[in-house]
Amino acid sequence: MNIKHKILGVVALSLLPLSLSAQSEMEAFRLGSPHEPVGSARYAALSGAMGAVGSDVASLVRNPAGISLFRGNNRLSLTLGGGFSTDRGVWYGTSTSQDMKGKFLFEEFSYQAGTNRASRGPVSFAFSIRNAGRFDRELHASAVLPQSANFSSLADFSAARTNNARYDNLRSPNVDKYFEKSYITTTAAFKNDYVPWMSILGAGAGWIDIDNGSRSYRSAYMYSTAPDGTPYPQPSIGLPDKADLVLREKGNITDYDIALGFEANDALHFGAALTLSSLDYEMASFYHEAFRGNNYLKLQNTKSVSGFGGSVGFGLLYEPVEGLRLGASLYTPTFYSMKMDFQAGSLGRYNNKALEVATPKSAANSYALRGNWRFGLSGAYFIGRHGFISADYDYTSGSLRLSNSTYDEYDGSEIGFEEDNARLKTNFGGVHTVRLGAEAMLSNRIALRAGYRYSSSPVKNARLKGDMASTEVLVSGPAVHYTLPDSQNSYSLGAGFRITPSLSLDLAYVYSDTKARTFAFPYVNDYGSYLNASDADIRAGKVKPDELVGMQAIKETNQRHKAVATLSIRF
């Protein structure tokens, strides 16, 4: 165990105290970031590089114009997929892993009516129900914390959030009363907009205590001697010896697509798709810190989110010379209406006294979430009837935006989410995705396929790119942990079999490797030393908060193995 050393920072955006209502930046990022649909087995085998290949209904997520290339009468397809994954975490040198066994699940169902200018005209139609992405994940991480490193405890974070809320409202009436310990340890405080719930959970469980001389809060885990028994000149704040984080997530996004394709001539095709999306997400987490003398703190969270939204996509394909096909596509953001509910409980033990507190049974609220724009370019070269090679490029904009769902105007109101949206724009940028695919026809009945996909990290702010964050992020209520994804790579293989003229079977295997960094709680600036600051000092820039750096990131690697099968029938 070591003693906390505070470092003075400079005044900048990342040093400003946070609005109490701005707590959903990371939730919006988690739910609104791009997800990779499995699609059909052919789509999976080509790693999604089907923007200029088309024909398959799954290709409409890359370019809706592709469905106009299906020239059969009707086709029904059903796709199932399953597999397993391993989630590994390394935290302060301690490695842990968790295996998740899978089962075969629904991936896609589709119906197509193809283009036939002789009998139907140049218009094609497609309908599909698709698993557009799953949130399933399980992380178990443990750390033996070093004696000499500079880090802070969740108790320090709770105290800083309390001090910052008080600093934000120094000139508000009754603010002193609202932050008295006798008040924030009552259930009435949960209904007070001035008081963060992390303050109530920390004070109620005995993690934090007030320094009556300065009016600021600090960690309650105070010690008079070092671990070896050497006396301190004065009681000092202690840090934990060990930490544990268990995180479980599950849920999925289901897309319902209706698409039309138009074949202007043999070389030029257009398409449009309407997508309705249903989102379900559940999270449960447990965090624990162990201090000297059998003292500890614990935090438990559960959260559920449901949402429904819609988007549209447009695409075109052009064949400038025989065998070469080029495509472009544009997809609007998905506009979600979201409902969230959560519960949290905290426990603490210090000096043989154990305390606990829980949030109200229901903390339901609603908001609106606008997703990202997406732009795509694609190309494919067909080698007669022997096969093809294809390449797709996607750019997903970093334009997530939260708004208040109680407002009726078209784009909603940012009231209560101004800071979240500002930080989403500052911290995250666009994602670049490259897909490569190839198909070789061994005969008229058998095809072999392979593919590769790479996606860049959406993290833009350099102060969030290291193992220790050096700027604040806004977390959702007491669920203070957050994850920042790094790059993603996936590799795929597959085969297609024409069993009869009307029946076909496609198979695929996909291996993906995703890296991420998970933080137990955010970096934060503590304004507790300036609760008596004058307006003149604030205007003169003399307020320089203490930096609490949090803990080192858990370096996470998720490896997934997936098998996909599609059965299609033409009629």
Residue ranges and their predicted role:
Residues 1-27, 571:
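Bacterial Sec-dependent N-terminal signal peptides
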Residues 16, 48-58, 423-427, 482:
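Short, charged, low-hydrophobicity "junction" segments
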Residues 23-38, 44, 114-571:
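Outer-membrane beta-barrel porins/channels
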Residues 25-50, 68-87:
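Transmembrane beta-strand segments of Gram-negative outer membrane beta-barrel proteins
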Residues 43, 57-58, 64, 364:
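Generic secondary-structure boundary/loop-capping signal
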Residues 47, 51, 62-65, 568:
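Short amphipathic alpha-helical segments enriched in leucine
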Residues 54-62, 68-147, 254:
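Outer-membrane beta-barrel translocator/receptor signature
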Residues 67-68, 84, 266, 278:
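Glycine-rich nucleotide phosphate-binding loop and flanking beta-alpha elements
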